[in-house]
Amino acid sequence: MLALISRLLDWFRSLFWKEEMELTLVGLQYSGKTTFVNVIASGQFSEDMIPTVGFNMRKVTKGNVTIKIWDIGGQPRFQSMWERYCRGVNAIVYMIDAADREKIEASRNELHNLLDKPQLQGIPVLVLGNKRDLPNALDEKQLIEKMNLSAIQDREICCYSISCKEKDNIDITLQWLIQHSKSRRS
């Protein structure tokens, strides 16, 4: 009986307290952006991902929060589109292949170049170091240092080490996004 009442209350709350947020997911190619979207949308991991050409848009509902995700291709020819799709969103999610140490400098430069754009000032950023299940992957502390995240002072910034394959820290990432959608409205 108590479970039924709880479910009814949740349903009733969802009628009046729906949250929506829009975010843009960017990062260098092969960092796991589309895989991340698939994992949070369906819980499914696939090794056979095709690189995103241009962009994909997907809506994911978690509880009473609907997240509209713009997944932008990471190839150099699409990086000029990043700023356009980051304007006006609730958050920017920047994905890094934490196991590919050769691309960390390029990834850092792209992130800082993007965040230097005046029209993106103040938009919170969630930096995700994906592929933590691989040997030699950077942990959160190393990512913060190598990506020079402490230099970013004009916005909220958060960093997590995740594995889409093992689904490590996906829940905490979603919690940050959902909490962020609620805090931006108040």
Swiss-Prot record:
It is found in: Late endosome membrane; Lysosome membrane; Cytoplasm, Cytoskeleton, Spindle; Cell projection, Axon. Signal peptide: none annotated. It catalyses: GTP + H2O = GDP + phosphate + H(+). GO terms for molecular function: G protein activity; GTP binding. GTP binds at residues 29-35, 71-75, 130-133. One of its GO terms (biological process) is late endosome to lysosome transport. Its EC number is 3.6.5.2. Residues 1-19 dip into the membrane without crossing it. Ubiquitinated at Lys-141 by RNF167, leading to its degradation. One of its GO terms (cellular component) is synapse. Belongs to the small GTPase superfamily. Arf family. Interacts with tubulin. Interacts with BORCS5; recruits ARL8B to lysosomes. Interacts with VPS41; the interaction mediates the recruitment of the HOPS complex to lysosomes. Interacts (GTP-bound form) with PLEKHM2 (via RUN domain); the interaction is required to recruit the motor protein kinesin-1 on lysosomes. Interacts (GTP-bound form) with PLEKHM1 (via RUN domain); the interaction is required for PLEKHM1 localization to lysosomes and for ARL8B function in delivery and degradation of endocytic and autophagic cargo in lysosomes. PLEKHM1 and PLEKHM2 compete for interaction with ARL8B. This is ADP-ribosylation factor-like protein 8B. It comes from Bos taurus (Bovine).
